[in-house]
C-alpha cells in the first residue's frame, strides 16, 4: 500500500491507473471522478478485500517473477514522473534494469477479462 506521502505526491500527477478513466474507457470511474479526487479533499477509496489480497500477494508474485524470468535487483514500490510530460506518473510494483513488474489480482470470475486465453502473461 502507498504511504500518505506517496498518496499526496500522486495527487499532483495523472497516474497510469487513472488514464483509462480520463480517456473514457474505464468501467469503474470517470474523468470527473479523477478530477474531483485531484482538486478536493475526497479521500482515496478504502481498501476492499480484493485490494488487500492483491497487496498481500505482491511480494511472493514479484519473487516468482524474479525466478521465472531470471530477474535480479528489482526495487519495489517505485514512483516515477515522466521526464517528457511531468504531469504523467506511474507507481510500479517493482522496477529493474529494463523491466517493470506490475502485479494484479483478479477473482476467478474477473480473470476472463484479462489477457488472452491460453497465454501465461497479459
Positions of PLM-derived features:
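Mg2+/Mn2+-dependent nuclease catalytic core
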Residues: 44, 51-55, 59-62, 66-121
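Charged, glycine-rich intrinsically disordered N-terminal tails and low-complexity linkers that flank
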Residues: 1-60
